[in-house]
């Protein structure tokens, strides 16, 4: 879906994670995320990775305290790397912007970004 003007969005690159196609993921540092149009009053952004071709597998994610920096460098959190057996899978990161560091409520924006892995 196209991104509307001023809509919360982000991009990412897999970076230098080890190639993994065994179905047994590694624990790796987050990719670099570049954020755009982060909602006003955002204090925390949580990131979750989902494999659209194996949606029941929990790759995890993490959260960062947002202070206005729109580049999130690798190492902010760790997660289970993409590691599809038998070909590329479609992976989606979801970023959830919150105005408070709370599991319940406070969500003020969501964005998604998808890439294949491996991206051959």
Task: Enumerate the language-model features and the residues they cover.
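N-terminus-centered regions that define maturation/targeting leaders and the start
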Residues: 2-120
């Amino acid at each position: 879906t196209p991104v509307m003007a001023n809509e919360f969005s982000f991009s990412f690159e897999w970076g230098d994670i080890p190639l993994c196609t065994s179905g047994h993921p590694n624990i790796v540092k987050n990719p670099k995320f570049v954020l755009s149009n982060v909602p006003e009053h955002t204090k925390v952004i949580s990131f979750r990775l989902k494999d659209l071709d194996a949606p029941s597998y929990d790759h995890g994610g993490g959260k960062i305290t947002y202070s206005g920096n729109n580049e999130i460098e690798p190492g902010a959190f760790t997660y289970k790397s993409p590691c599809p057996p038998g070909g590329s899978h479609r992976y989606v990161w979801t970023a959830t912007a919150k105005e408070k560091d709370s599991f319940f409520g406070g969500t003020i924006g969501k964005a998604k970004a998808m890439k294949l892995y491996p991206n051959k």
